[in-house]
Each structure stands twice: as C-alpha cells, then as structure tokens.
Curated annotation (Swiss-Prot):
Protein name: UPF0047 protein YugU
Domain of life: Bacteria
Gene name per UniProt: yugU
Disulfide bonds: none
Listed Pfam families: UPF0047
Similarity remark: Belongs to the UPF0047 family.
C-alpha cells in the first residue's frame, strides 16, 4: 500500500517530523509484520531517522550541515546556485526503511522520522510504502 504526503516547507533548511503520519498510515493498512519504506523523490531534500526528544538536535544538525556545506562557495558551478542543498540531500539520503512488528514501527526510544528540506520553502512530495 502506498501513501503520498504533500509537505509544505516554510524555510530554506528545516527538518519536519513525519513519524505520526507514518504511524497513522501503518494503522490504516492493518499490516502487523513487515516494513515501511519512506522515500523522497527530490534532489534537494531527504529522509532521515534521528532524535525527536530534544528540538535542539535538529537545530544543531542544520547548523553543522551549513558549516560543512555553506550555501555560497566560490567554486560552485551549478547554475541554480543550490549546490549546498544537493550535497546535504546526498548526505542524508532519499529513503529510510523501518521494521514493522506487532503493528508498530520499530524505532528507538528517542527516534523519529524526518523529512529534511534543504532548498525551501516549497511544496514537496514524500511517499510511504507499507509492505507486509
């Protein structure tokens, strides 16, 4: 079963917790054992799993990405001027798999699933595929 999420981002760089949306879709499907695939079809956005208890972790991650991949660099040649967004997206990755067992996502105590925007604000698409 496949669900399409439309995500409206509000900043150039942000991490949006989509864990609840993934959990809600899992409940809709009735799948009790299998896997969830969360996929982002964009070259300047991505999907990651990371801590969701302390909001400063997201801020720190975005700050550190900016340190490694500054928005403007004298050697960048990409005509759209968003090479940093492409680099961040490649670092994070386009997808994540999560095991499903007993009708629940198997995530660590502090883990959440994040849609990562690196070239916003925009309306983005994210796919969730439940397999079981």
């Amino acid at each position: 079963m496949l669900k399409t999420l439309q995500i409206k981002t509000t900043k150039r760089d942000e991490m949006i917790d989509i864990t609840r949306e993934v959990e809600a879709f899992l409940q809709e499907t009735g799948i009790t054992s299998g896997a969830a695939l969360i996929y982002c079809p964009h070259t300047t956005a991505g999907i990651t799993i990371n801590e969701n208890a302390d909001p400063d972790v997201k801020k720190d991650m975005l700050r550190r990405f900016d340190e490694v991949y500054p928005w403007e660099h004298e050697l960048d040649r990409h005509m759209e001027g968003n090479t940093a967004a492409h680099m961040k997206s490649s670092t994070v990755g386009a997808s994540q798999h999560v095991i499903v067992e007993n009708g629940r996502l198997i995530l660590g105590t502090w883990q959440g699933i994040y849609f990562c925007e690196f070239d916003g604000p925009r309306t983005r698409t994210c796919y969730i595929k439940m397999m079981g």
